[in-house]
Amino acid sequence: MKSIIFNEIKKILECDFALENPKDKNLAHFATPLAFSLAKELKKSPMLIASDLASKFQNHDCFELVEAVNGYLNFRISKTFLNELANQALTNPNDFTKGEKKQESFLLEYVSANPTGPLHIGHARGAVFGDTLTRLARHLGYKFDTEYYVNDAGNQIYLLGLSILLSVKENILHENVEYPEQYYKGEYIADLAKEAFEKFGKEFFSEENIPSLADWAKDKMLVLIKQNLEQVKIKIDSYVSERSYYDALNATLESLKEHKGIYEQEGKIWLASSQKGDEKDRVIIREDGRGTYLAADIVYHKDKMSRGYGKCINIWGADHHGYIPRMKAAMEFLGFDSNNLEIILAQMVSLLKDGEPYKMSKRAGNFILMSDVVDEIGSDALRYIFLSKKCDTHLEFDISDLQKEDSSNPVYYINYAHARIHQVFAKAGKKIDDVMKADLQSLNQDGVNLLFEALNLKAVLNDAFEARALQKIPDYLKNLAANFHKFYNENKVVGSANENDLLKLFSLVALSIKTAFSLMGIEAKNKMEH
């Protein structure tokens, strides 16, 4: 709606201007401070200029009122125009707020957790954010592909194999074993050990078979990770292996050398990242000739940046913050625009239950498993809470609040608004088709403002995507639900003289809730279950 109004205003003003959303919708739905920027050029006061501009909008179909207020030009949308937009939305509900196909393309790499165990709650935040960003981008018309980078070549994979070997020796063969400082523990390792022993037999469990054991376990963990993701309605387009990039390492090093991006010192090869803003240079090839994790990651990013996407986006854990300058430096040395590599950081999550820290999973050792939390509160509540705050800010929540059936549980509160609307239609014995001819002229100002809010979802979605600020969607839904509940409590609907106008208004509110929830990966309920 905002873009439509902007274009209508631009036809008359014939110049560029900023269009703002005033908080008090009783004063205006939109406003522009254009008169202030014209004051110097026209040598007039902003108030006079705004008054002159307002006079150009007399008898415009889109606006009920256009007036100058303290130098601002305020616009209130007409009921007739809002009704036209409502008819379009209700006639084609599946296309509501959808964007036209755009030329811009994106590649999102996210989750990319080491395939050494099930997903924990820290992985879940970036996973939910990435999936919602994907849904939103595609809904708005962007080409948006997703990828999971499988770290299947590093020391972590070897440690997985070693941990299983030691578990077999200790718990099945009852041998005395000495555990290294770093290893994987938890019930899932014991389960893998038992399964591996049954599959491979006693003779297999020697140090020389650790790589084979690690490969087998890695594949099992990748299947488990995909199941964890499916549990929260996430499907990633492609999984790429770190190992598959090994053959491209030498060519990448040659390219870096040509661009003076690397040098040799102390028997190691260093990335000269300090030249590009990093705090120091970084080792990419060790003294023994083995590449560091950074080396493999540079090769992978070179490939991603070469595929023709307008922008490559990564979602990383906040602990990778220091990794950003070195990766951007490498891309610049390789001739890419580092602005086309966008990094979104997912901050830490603190989980409580009844005010106390949530217990770590026995299955995973020292982590809270994502699947455990989903089992307790469901996928919808988990997704909502992870989207309720900006991704790069710390998030703390008590899962007990998400099990309540009252306004303190935002998922329940918003769903209750959606279910309530279905209940009202049932009580009135009507369907949406029965109210399509209502013209909404009888709506009071609160009703008009609620309708405006429901129809303004597209602007919220655009803002959320462009700013990567997905919390704008749950914020919008909370306000919409609160305003609906207030309006419903203050206005008689079934049996009133303007029943059809109110039901049509409510159907728009329900459509906005359903659309926004769908983009968040949440199901809008038609009926609340107790």
Swiss-Prot record:
Stored Pfam families: Arg_tRNA_synt_N (PF03485), DALR_1 (PF05746), tRNA-synt_1d (PF00750)
Annotated Gene3D superfamilies: Arginyl tRNA synthetase N-terminal domain, HUPs, Isoleucyl-tRNA Synthetase, Domain 1
Enzyme Commission no: 6.1.1.19
PROSITE patterns linked to this entry: AA_TRNA_LIGASE_I
Entry-linked InterPro entries: aa-tRNA-synth_I_CS, Arg-tRNA-ligase, Arg-tRNA-synth_N, Arg-tRNA-synth_N_sf, ArgRS_core, DALR_anticod-bd, Rossmann-like_a/b/a_fold, tRNAsynth_Ia_anticodon-bd
Compartments (UniProt record): Cytoplasm
Residue window of motif 'HIGH' region: 113-123
Cellular component annotations (GO), alphabetically ordered: cytoplasm
GO BP, one annotated term: arginyl-tRNA aminoacylation
Keywords: Aminoacyl-tRNA synthetase, ATP-binding, Cytoplasm, Ligase, Nucleotide-binding, Protein biosynthesis
Primary enzyme class: ligase
GO MF, one example: arginine-tRNA ligase activity
Source taxon at top rank: Bacteria
Reactions catalysed: tRNA(Arg) + L-arginine + ATP = L-arginyl-tRNA(Arg) + AMP + diphosphate
Primary site of residence: cytoplasm
The family this protein is said to belong to: Belongs to the class-I aminoacyl-tRNA synthetase family.
Subunit structure: Monomer.
NCBIfam families membership: argS (TIGR00456)
Name used for this protein in its record: Arginine--tRNA ligase
